[in-house]
Amino acid sequence: MRLRHERARLSALVALAALVSAGQAVTLRAHGTEARRVVSLTWKRDHITRVLDANRSELGLNGSKAPAQMMTIGGQACLFGDLFAFDVDDRYAFDVDEPVDVTVTYAPDRTQPFAIAWDKNGGDGYGISKEISPEPGATLRKATVRLERARFAGLGILNTDLAVGARGGIALCDISIVRSAATKAAAPRGRVQIEVKDAETGELVPARLGLYDATGRTPLPSDQALLIHRYADETRLLWVAPRLLWPSAERQAFYVNGTYETQVPAGSYEVVATKGPEYRVFKGAVDVKAGQLARVAIPLQRFINQPSRGWYSGDTHLHLMREQTQDVAVWGQVAAEDVHVGNLLEMGNIVTTHYRQPAWGRAGRYLRDGHLIASGQEDPRTTERGHTIHHNLQKPIHLPPEDFFSYHKVFEASHMQGGVSGYAHMAQIFNGRRGLSLDAPFGLVDFIEVLQGGRLGVDNWYPYLNLGFKISPAAGSDYPYFGPSLPGVERYYVKLDGPFDPDAWYSSFKAGHAFVTNGPLLDFTINGRGMGEEIHVARGAQLQIAAAARLNPDIDAMGRLDLIVQGDVAVTERASGGDRIELRKELTADHSMWIAVRATGNREVPAQGQLQELGAIAHSAPIYVVVDDQPFWKTPAVAELVRGEHQILQDLLTAPVDPMGDLEAWETVSVLAPQWERQRYLLRSRVQQADAKYDDILRRATARSSSAQARLGSAGLVVVAAFALAIVRGRDRRRRC
């Protein structure tokens, strides 16, 4: 049954791909691109103007990649699918604040437990009902859910108001909406005028704002708030996810470019403003009287001025389409989060490209007031080999479908253009470790995105450092995915010796002069040399290590600062109060090694291995200590690491294809799977070359350790050599298969 169900879903996806190519999906909107699966359905119901079959609701419920089906059950026209979004007729209810009853008619034998999500006043700005278990015993059943503080202001996907979803599907046969008409009459209005300035310079600055009445409701922003692009949505009001810096229990916010004015009902309001981790949070209040103007001056105080210290932040991963290079709204959103380099990525799959950029190279850069937006690409990207990112390109690089899995060709072309290239989501998903395992030994990978979604994925980074590869850390929000997030929630800082310059910034990042963070700010030197640098010393030389971490107390209190030597915690300093920790240590350089530092906040979050370290966290790029010109391998671990890389490459060649694994499977399903079956066999020679490079590292590491093993006795040497030989012979046998 399960296989038949999967085949049916796959057939439906192929059919949907044909519909999309025929132009029957929801059309794209200005400044956005519809990278979600969204199909408009004809299913008329009272007080409903539009019904969408979608894979996201933007109200807290998500669906799947499979399209909905129409069917007749009990004489009624029913929809079967995972998620449906509904646009409530504005003439019936718009921007209300009252309980609303929603009654759903469903077919129990075709319905899994389901929930209803809605556009809500206060709190997160959306509500999700308790899961409703289908009640068997009849062809059709009804369930009524009361939506508390329903708003219906079009804040869901493509300006919808509520959604019904079930993992595994719901057969939805009717839906009715009944207002309680309890919304209070609007109070007389006054005006509020807000100015946001940098307290040091007195200059107006972009910022993220919140404005909340006594009930937690935020008035819909005026057109002076920045118009934000979220996929193909255009909105001014955004949800601030719990892991994002925000000091209020009310978690809806908007962006302003220094000034903001609007009309609001008379009353008392809470005012909140933030501008990234280098600024203290502002919280204040304003009383608005009917017919009068209330002014609010917000002086944002610096916690620290990183640019004055030579550090400039970036977000490696933003999906924001521009129609022109000088897009003030896109720039404003990035600048409001105080991100100095916002990398706007086209997002390609084997069929098409989303989030198109208007120009490339210097022509694609918009630099204003020290904040830059620039074109880049996330392409190629597949579930089979992972997602790749390429910055600072002079022109986009898109492989044809018949060569789409030859990622190395894009890396090589990027480097020829002066680009900086790496792998995305390495704390997350999409099998990026397979692609990294294949491309790293050829020296193609400049960075990996180790911090994203609140997670630090060192499990996919440390092994390559321990095998002697210099790979820089990067961090990116992947806006509007992951939450949704907001730009700069995870960011990386790059060190410059002079004034901010985009070319120098990308060069310094490629050289590894960087750290990643979602809050803590790092300093780290060895013998006066900084992150990403290489220090050559003689055996026995003394290493003077100095490190420090600071954390804006509005984010969290400082917790600890760890000194990491080849993946192991060598020294820990714990906070004793205040917003700063210092670590000073002297080590003896008895072998080559890489050394880094990691800082965390005080809030304890359960961890599941190194992948799941959540909370405030930062990690530096390594400093590479080279003793007597020897590689900085973690020699005792090399044999096991090489064996692991061989297995990963074997998985790349043999793992079964997941036709629905691609993020936009509705677009790619008819092309990607057959192309992968053809092309992965063409990768065998590339895999064999990578295997040979790993084997060479193993041979050299074994030879290097022979003298040390001899001191342990000849038996120890024989065991190590035999282990290494067994791995190599195993590789040779596999090559002959």
What label would you give each PLM region?
Residues L28-A93, G122:
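Glycan-recognition and processing domains
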Residues S714-R731:
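A cross-kingdom C-terminal cell-surface attachment/processing module
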Residues T105-R110, R550:
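Solvent-exposed strand-to-loop "edge" motifs in beta-rich extracellular domains
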Residues G123-L155:
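Extracellular carbohydrate recognition and processing domains
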Residues K142-I175, H317:
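Extracellular beta-strand ligand-recognition surfaces/modules
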Residues K197-T262, S268-Q306, L467-P473, S477-S707:
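C-terminal functional module detector
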Residues Y255, F282, Q306-P484, P502-A504, ...:
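Catalytic cores of extracellular degradative/oxidative enzymes
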Residues V178-R191, K197-G202:
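Beta-strand-rich domain onsets/edges
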